[in-house]
Amino acid sequence: MSSQALDSAKVAFIEAAIEHGVLLFGNFTLKSGRQSPYFFNAGLLYSSSLLSTTAQAYAKVLSSSRIPDFDVLFGPAYKGISLAAVSAVSLYQQTGKDIGYCYNRKEKKDHGEGGTMVGAPLKGRIVIIDDVLTSGKAIREAIDILKASPEAKLVGIVQLVDRQEKGQSGSGKSTVQEVEEEFGVPVEPIIGLDDIVKYLESSGKWEKELQEVRKYRAEYGVQRS
């Protein structure tokens, strides 16, 4: 793990997530059945202050060299909708880059404008905004939506948290690494497990939690390439 200090956007996001109970430490059973010493609940990202901090962190990643140039943010229903919207606003405020955003309906609308897509036309270079990639099922469903639009080209994915742990496929790779290899696009997080560990180390207030997270990482963790 790099000894480089966390940047201010990551620190602000982690501190806000802890303060609002979005990032929790304890004993949690994941969908995979694993017992995890930490849990990230993106469903609690509903206050204006926390959304602002989250959007700023997204915008920083979106404007970095790690994400190719793009035209539209796509936020998969439901959690991705608000995340894409606030990220588009923050990106414009930070950089002046004027991009569109869109999202899908899970139920097709047969009146008014109709269809399953809302917002900017799904064409050009697309970046998907999501929260946490677990099994990879949801992100593959989102990519299938893009594939149905011949004018859309996926160029990247930005997620809230990379758990940096081995997936369930037996490959020894994380879900993020598998998605990157399968689709040939970068998957960049606002924070990863290494960042959480680094924050706990630097704070000096979470020694018990730090030890548990380190143990979990030693058993299940993978390094980002």
Swiss-Prot record:
Keywords: Glycosyltransferase, Pyrimidine biosynthesis, Transferase
Reactions accelerated catalytically: orotidine 5'-phosphate + diphosphate = orotate + 5-phospho-alpha-D-ribose 1-diphosphate
PROSITE patterns in alphabetical order: PUR_PYR_PR_TRANSFER
Keyword Ribosomal protein on entry: no
A GO BP entry: 'de novo' UMP biosynthetic process
MF terms in GO: orotate phosphoribosyltransferase activity
Stored Pfam families: Pribosyltran
Top EC group: transferase
Entry binding sites for 5-phospho-alpha-D-ribose 1-diphosphate: 31, 78-79, 105-106, 109, 111, 130-138
InterPro entries, per the entry: OPRT, Or_phspho_trans_dom, PRibTrfase_dom, PRTase-like
GO cellular component, one term: cytoplasm
Binding locations of orotate: 39-40, 134, 163
EC number: 2.4.2.10
Pathway: Pyrimidine metabolism; UMP biosynthesis via de novo pathway; UMP from orotate: step 1/2
Its job: Catalyzes the transfer of a ribosyl phosphate group from 5-phosphoribose 1-diphosphate to orotate, leading to the formation of orotidine monophosphate (OMP).
Entry's family note: Belongs to the purine/pyrimidine phosphoribosyltransferase family. PyrE subfamily.
Self-association and partners: Homodimer.
Alphabetical list of NCBIfam families matching this protein: pyrE
Protein name in the entry: Orotate phosphoribosyltransferase
Organism annotation: Cryptococcus neoformans var. neoformans serotype D (strain JEC21 / ATCC MYA-565)
